[in-house]
Amino acid sequence: MTQSWNNTSEQENFVLSLLGNKKGGHYVELGAFHSKNGSNTNRLENEFDWKGVSFEIKEDLRKEFNENRSNPCMGDALDFNYISYFEDNSFPKQIDYLQVDIDAGYKKNGRPDGSAYTSLHGLLAVPLNSYRFTVITFEHDANMYWRNDVMRDVQREILDSLGYSLVVRTESEDWWVDPKVIGLEEYRKYFRWDHL
């Protein structure tokens, strides 16, 4: 039976389902936005006792997040020493979940408000050669702006070359698993390839 997953909070359901409602996991969230509304990690932290670190460049959202959540929300995901943070906070080498969704939104004319490649830069900032992630969700918004097709494709090349398996592919997001941790028989029931 194929599962149907939407975006935003459904990412948490996808992660929890693949990991058997794991308690005490670890996450890294690039692009936190609000602490609860549209959050991809609120349930992980508050219902399943996950430890994690989030990033939000907008100061008002970061302040709101830090006032309402226990796990910290930092500023710039592109200028952060991930390895030191992970070591200082006892993150495992196999982190359960990486969420990448850092963009500044879109103007009325459909152009990005800032770089079209911020999420890709965020992915490249994470030490992918030193740490692995069991589940990765990457928002590329290829449906929003034509240049995002390039970002989507480069992200796919990077994660595929690192041995990750693409499980969910929509017009705006890609969801990946580490097949060294989650076997094909487990993740194949979640396959969803809506778009290139």
Language model: regions and residue ranges:
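SAM cofactor-binding core of SAM-dependent methyltransferases
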Residues: T2-S84
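Secondary-structure boundary motif
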Residues: G20-N21, N46, E67, D88, ...
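Conserved acidic-Pro-Pro-aromatic motif
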Residues: R43, W50-K51, K93-V100, A104-L196
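Conserved amphipathic alpha-helix within the SDR
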Residues: S84-F91
